[in-house]
């Protein structure tokens, strides 16, 4: 239950309604927020995460040993160096 409360759609609801249990007692019931609110939260979270993930994927890709990928890696690195050099000179 504790781990379930850490999920963004439960934390971002902002309200708690109640439900009746079998014994007739009122207990708090967490409701999921609407999809627009959830998407906004996901986009905000993704924006914070995207850049580090891209760097990790890039590093993982560069570490692959497949001959075709080694060729592509070399080609991409050469183009990157040329691009970087061009950026510095302009």
Swiss-Prot record:
Entry's localization field: Host mitochondrion inner membrane; Host nucleus; Host cytoplasm, Host cytosol
Region described as Mitochondrial targeting sequence: 65-87
Highest taxon in the source lineage: Viruses
Keyword Nucleotidyltransferase listed: no
Entries under InterPro entries matching the protein: Flu_proapoptotic_PB1-F2
Keyword Membrane in annotation: yes
Site for Low pathogenicity, residues: 66
Function text: Plays an important role in promoting lung pathology in both primary viral infection and secondary bacterial infection. Promotes alteration of mitochondrial morphology, dissipation of mitochondrial membrane potential, and cell death. Alternatively, inhibits the production of interferon in the infected cell at the level of host mitochondrial antiviral signaling MAVS. Its level of expression differs greatly depending on which cell type is infected, in a manner that is independent of the levels of expression of other viral proteins. Monocytic cells are more affected than epithelial cells.
Complexes and interactors: Oligomer. Interacts with human SLC25A6/ANT3 and VDAC1. Interacts with host MAVS.
Protein name: Protein PB1-F2
Organism annotation: Influenza A virus (strain A/Henry/1936 H1N1)
């Amino acid at each position: 239950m504790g781990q379930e409360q850490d999920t963004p759609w439960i934390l971002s609801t902002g309200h708690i309604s109640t439900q009746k249990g079998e014994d007739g007692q009122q207990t708090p019931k967490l409701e999921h927020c609407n999809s627009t609110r959830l998407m906004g939260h996901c986009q905000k979270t993704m924006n914070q995460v995207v850049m580090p993930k891209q760097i990790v994927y890039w590093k993982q890709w560069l570490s692959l040993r497949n001959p075709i990928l080694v060729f592509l890696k070399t080609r991409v690195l050469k183009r990157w160096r040329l691009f970087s050099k061009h950026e510095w000179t302009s």
